[in-house]
Regions:
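N-terminal lobe/hinge region of extracytoplasmic solute-binding protein
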Residues: 63-114, 122, 145
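Gly/Pro-rich hinge or "lid" segments in bacterial periplasmic/extracellular proteins
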Residues: 97-98, 186-252, 262, 373, ...
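Aromatic- and charge-enriched surface segment that lines or borders ligand/interaction sites
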Residues: 109-152, 165, 171, 316
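Surface-exposed binding/hinge segments that line
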Residues: 112, 116, 154-198, 203-205, ...
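Alpha-helical secondary-structure segments
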Residues: 137-142, 169-171, 213-214, 248-252, ...
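Structural transition elements
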Residues: 215, 345-381, 399-401
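Detector for C-terminal structural segments
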Residues: 225, 304, 329-358, 399-408, ...
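Ligand-site clamp/hinge motif
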Residues: 236-286
Length: 546
C-alpha cells in the first residue's frame, strides 16, 4: 500500500484507506489493555467498504499549546495558526500516492500537468462559502496571487502566476520546475477564499473568517478561546466526495489556547477539555498507563541530524572515513532513550519515511548502526588528527543541549574531545554559514512531502552554500537532478541517497514523537500531513459526553 500522506485516521487497532478523491474507512476497535497507539503520518491499510461510523456530538473541547495570534488566511505560518488552519479554511487538494497525480481533491475536481512549470486545476462548480458567495476560478487565482504578494512564505517567490482559464479552471504557473512545489502550495500553503468575502472583511479575516470550511467561526478571544460551529450549509453534500479533512462530527468545537505546556495536561485531567493536542513527551507519561485516556503517538515531521564542516581546510574536508567514524560512534537508540524517553523513531535516511517518494528498502539497509569497533577502525584509516577539539554547534534548546552532551560522551569513548557551542537562533543562523565557527552542526529539519525537498540543503545555490559547506560537483548535480520534474525518478532518487550515505555528508538520527491525548470515548483522530489535529474529523463513541 502506497502512502497517503495527508491522512491519519488513528483508531485503536483500526485500518484505513484513502481512495482517489474520497475516503473509505473500516474500523475494528478493541481497546483492551491498549494505552498508546503509534501513528505514522500517512499510515494506511486496505479495506473494501466504508463501515466507519462516529456519533454526532454536540460539543468537543480541545487544548492547543500555541498562541494563535490571528486567523487570517495569508499571514505567516506560526505553530498556532497551523494548528487551526485546516479547520478554518480548505485547500485545493491533499497528498494521495494512490492517485495518478499524487493528489486528491478537496475543492479541486481534477488537475493535469500542462508542462514542467504549469498545472491546470479545475474546481467543483458548486462551491459556496459560509456567506453564500459562489467560489469560482477567479477566487482561486485571487487566493494564490494574494498569498504570493503577501510574501509570508519562502515559497511565495516561486509562483509566477495563477490565471483563469475558464469559470472553474485555473493555470498555476511556477518559475521553477522543482518537484513538489506546486503540490505543496495546493495542499498546505494557500488557503482558498472568495475575493468577495476577503475584500468585504474589515480586518482581513484576522478574527472574522469566511471560508468554504465545514465550520464557521462564531467567537474568538485572542489568547484564550476560539469557537467554531458546524456549517449547516456546507457546500459538499456528496458524502463520497467529502475529503478526509472536511468531516464535522462535532456540532461545536471550542479550542482552549493554553501556552503553558503543563497546563495542557491539567486541562485534560480536570475535564476542561476532551482532547489535548501536541502534548510533550514530558507530560504524556501520566496518561500512558491511566484508564480513561487514549494516547496517540505521532512520528513528527521534524528529525534530528548532524552534518560536518567539509569546507577546504576543515578537519572533515575530503575525509568520509572520519565522518563515518563519528556516526558509527553515536548510539542513536541511546539518544532516543536519554533525550526523548523512548518517544522517538530511529532514522534510516536523510528523509522522513512518510514522504511520498521514500524508498522503504532504505529501512533494511545499513545506516551507521552503533559500532564502536568499526568507528575505531574508520578513525584509524582516516588518518585524522585526533588531538583536535571538535566544535559541536547547535541552536540553543533543551533537547539539543542534551543530545550534544550525549554525543560528546560517545565521541570521548573514541578518544575525541568536543566543545559544545549552543547559540540563540539569530547567531546560529549567521554562524552556520561560516566555516571558521564549527566542525559539526546538530539541528533539525522538517520533511513533509518529498524526500528530495531536502536535496536543496546539499547544493550550492547562489551565495548560499550546502549545509555541510562542501564543494562537490557530483553532489551538486545529483541534488539539482532529483529536484527537477524530469529527473525525479526512483533510480535517480536512490542514486542521490546512496551518494549522500557514501560521502556521509549528513547523518539523520531520529524523529521525535509528539502526542495527541484524548478521553477514551474519542475512538480515533485525524491529522493532516504535518501532524496537526482536526478535531471535527475525530471518531466519537456513543458514550462521549462534554
Amino acid at each position: 500500500m502506497k502512502k497517503v500522506l495527508s491522512l491519519v485516521l488513528a483508531t485503536l487497532l483500526a485500518t484505513t484507506m484513502i481512495g482517489c478523491g474520497n475516503a473509505n474507512v473500516e474500523s475494528t476497535t478493541d481497546q483492551t489493555d491498549v494505552k498508546e497507539t503509534q501513528v505514522e503520518l500517512g499510515s494506511a491499510g486496505v479495506v473494501s467498504e466504508n463501515t466507519e461510523t462516529s456519533a454526532q456530538v454536540e460539543e468537543v473541547s480541545v487544548a492547543i499549546s500555541y498562541d494563535v495570534s490571528n486567523l487570517a488566511p495569508f499571514t505567516s505560518a506560526t505553530s498556532g495558526r497551523l494548528s487551526l488552519i485546516q479547520t478554518l479554511y480548505e485547500y485545493l487538494a491533499y497528498y494521495d500516492a494512490d492517485s495518478d497525480t499524487g493528489l486528491s481533491g478537496i475543492l479541486m475536481k481534477e488537475c493535469e500537468k500542462i508542462d514542467n512549470y504549469t498545472t491546470r486545476v479545475t474546481i467543483y462548480d458548486y462551491i459556496y462559502d459560509s456567506a453564500g458567495n459562489h467560489l469560482t476560478a477567479s477566487d482561486v487565482a485571487f487566493s494564490f496571487n494574494t498569498w504570493a504578494e503577501a510574501g509570508n512564505s519562502v515559497k511565495c517567490k516561486l509562483l509566477d502566476s495563477c490565471t483563469v482559464v475558464d469559470e472553474f479552471t485555473v493555470d498555476i504557473k511556477l518559475n521553477t520546475d522543482s518537484v513538489g512545489d506546486v503540490e505543496n502550495m495546493m495542499c498546505g500553503l494557500v488557503p482558498i477564499v472568495t475575493q468577495a468575502a476577503y475584500e468585504a472583511s474589515d480586518d482581513g479575516m484576522i478574527e472574522k473568517v469566511v471560508s468554504t470550511s465545514p465550520y464557521i467561526v462564531t467567537d474568538y478571544v485572542e489568547g484564550s478561546t476560539l469557537t467554531v460551529e458546524k456549517n449547516p450549509n456546507y457546500w459538499q453534500t456528496n458524502e463520497d466526495l467529502v475529503s478526509p479533512f472536511s468531516h464535522s462530527n462535532a456540532d461545536k468545537i471550542v479550542y482552549h489556547i493554553v501556552t503553558e505546556a503543563s497546563q495542557v495536561s491539567t486541562n485534560l485531567e480536570t475535564d476542561v477539555v476532551d482532547i489535548a493536542a501536541n502534548m510533550t513527551s514530558s507530560e504524556v507519561g501520566r496518561f500512558q498507563n491511566t484508564d480513561g485516556y487514549n494516547v496517540y503517538a505521532i512520528a513528527g515531521t521534524n528529525f534530528n541530524w548532524i552534518t560536518f564542516n567539509c569546507s577546504e581546510g576543515g578537519m572533515f574536508y575530503n575525509n568520509p572515513d572520519f565522518r563515518k567514524a563519528i556516526c558509527y560512534a553515536i548510539d542513536a537508540n541511546g539518544i532516543i532513550e536519554g533525550v526523548f524517553n523512548g518517544g522517538a523513531k530511529l532514522s534510516k535516511a536523510y528523509a522522513n519515511p512518510e514522504c511520498i517518494d521514500y524508498n522503504s528498502e532504505w529501512d533494511s539497509e545499513e545506516y551507521y548502526e552503533y559500532n564502536i569497533e568499526k568507528a575505531k577502525e574508520l578513525l584509524a584509516s582516516s588518518g585524522a588528527d585526533t588531538s583536535q577539539t571538535i566544535r559541536i554547534m547547535y541552536p540553543q534548546t533543551t533537547n539539543n543541549k542534551s543530545m550534544a552532551q550525549i554525543i560528546q560522551s560517545y565521541l570521548l569513548e573514541l578518544g575525541l574531545n568536543c566543545e559544545l557551542l549552543g547559540y540563540e537562533s539569530a547567531l546560529y543562523q549567521t554562524y552556520k554559514y561560516e566555516a571558521g565557527e564549527w566542525d559539526i552542526i546538530l539541528d533539525q529539519k522538517q520533511s513533509v512531502d518529498y524526500v528530495t525537498s531536502l536535496a536543496s540543503t546539499l547544493q550550492v545555490s547562489g551565495d548560499t552554500p550546502a549545509i555541510c559547506l562542501v564543494d562537490d560537483e557530483k553532489m551538486q548535480d545529483l541534488a539539482v537532478l532529483v529536484q527537477s520534474n524530469e529527473g525525479h525518478t526512483a533510480e535517480n532518487v536512490n542514486e542521490y541517497m546512496e551518494y549522500v550515505k557514501e560521502q556521509c555528508y549528513v547523518y539523520a538520527i531520529c524523529q521525535e514523537n509528539f502526542y495527541h491525548v484524548t478521553e477514551s470515548s474519542v475512538n480515533g483522530i485525524v491529522t493532516n500531513f504535518k501532524g496537526w489535529l482536526l478535531p471535527g474529523c475525530s471518531t466519537f463513541g456513543d458514550d462521549f459526553e462534554r
